[in-house]
UniProtKB/Swiss-Prot annotation:
S-adenosyl-L-methionine binds at residues 77, 82, 128-129, 147. HAMAP family: 16SrRNA_methyltr_G. This is Ribosomal RNA small subunit methyltransferase G. Keywords: Cytoplasm, Methyltransferase, rRNA processing, S-adenosyl-L-methionine, Transferase. Its EC number is 2.1.1.-. PANTHER family: S-ADENOSYL-L-METHIONINE-DEPENDENT METHYLTRANSFERASES SUPERFAMILY PROTEIN. It comes from Bacillus licheniformis (strain ATCC 14580 / DSM 13 / JCM 2505 / CCUG 7422 / NBRC 12200 / NCIMB 9375 / NCTC 10341 / NRRL NRS-1264 / Gibson 46). Residues 216-239 are annotated as: Disordered.
Length: 239
């Protein structure tokens, strides 16, 4: 996906990028490739691939979730900033918080945020299980995102505690998510959520399947969740 295709593809979805925003994406790409030589951020480094599989893929969440109505977003396990930072570039009013367990990545994100001239971004080096118990962050966010970092049953325990009541948890998944959704239903219900919609679409050009799962927070998460670090992954809430 070249820059013209990227711009036109977003335009079709009602997202018009300014020259400044296009510069931000260009800087993002340059920093990603440069820092990737020092640390493992991504296996995808070819420009057309980055624009398609990282930038466009991240922004695709906004085709189904109205981020214009959101104010606060938390991204769990964002790695090199996906999906939250491409979303932030497109919707600059958002206050974005990223939590990641690797301090090197947090250092990269802090530097990147400055280079992109982003405002209202915060980066935390922490485990999601610990972060979700913090009074400052628990049930504080309009929307929480996660992109393919774990199974849905595990992700729900890491993410739903951070979502405020009536807010959304948005999980971005690659191939068919049917099995994950089925095994994740118990965890979602236990943690106060309910699946609102599942959007399946084809990523342009390469036509690979993507799924965006939108979960609404209906009630408070019980105080015992999330459990201690590592437990959600070892013993997911599955029925």
């Amino acid at each position: 996906m070249n820059i013209e295709q990227f711009t036109a593809g977003l335009e079709k979805k009602g997202i018009s990028l300014s020259s400044f925003q296009l510069e931000q994406f260009e800087t993002y790409y340059e920093w990603l490739v440069e820092w990737n030589e020092k640390m493992n951020l991504t296996s995808i480094t070819e420009k057309k691939e980055v624009y398609l599989k990282h930038f466009y893929d991240s922004i695709a969440a906004s085709f189904y979730v109205d981020f214009k109505k959101m104010n606060t977003l938390c991204d769990v396990g964002a790695g090199a900033g996906f999906p939250s930072l491409p979303i932030k570039i497109c919707f600059p009013h958002l206050h974005v918080t990223i939590v990641d367990s690797l301090n090197k990545r947090i250092h990269f994100l802090n530097q990147l945020s400055d280079a992109l001239k982003l405002e209202n971004t915060a980066f935390y080096h922490d485990r999601a299980e610990t972060f979700g118990r913090s009074k400052d962050h628990r049930e504080s966010y309009d929307v929480v995102t996660a992109r393919a970092v774990a199974r849905l049953s595990v992700l729900s325990e890491l993410c739903l505690p951070l979502v405020k009541k009536d807010g959304l948890f948005v999980a971005l998944k690659a191939a068919s998510a049917d099995e994950e959704i089925e095994t994740g239903k118990k965890a979602i219900k236990t943690l106060g959520g309910k699946i609102e919609t599942v959007h399946s679409f084809q990523l342009p050009i390469e036509e690979s399947e993507r799924n965006i799962i939108v979960i609404k927070k209906q009630s408070q998460t019980p105080k015992k969740f999330p459990r201690k670090p590592g437990t959600p992954n070892k013993s997911p809430i599955e029925g």
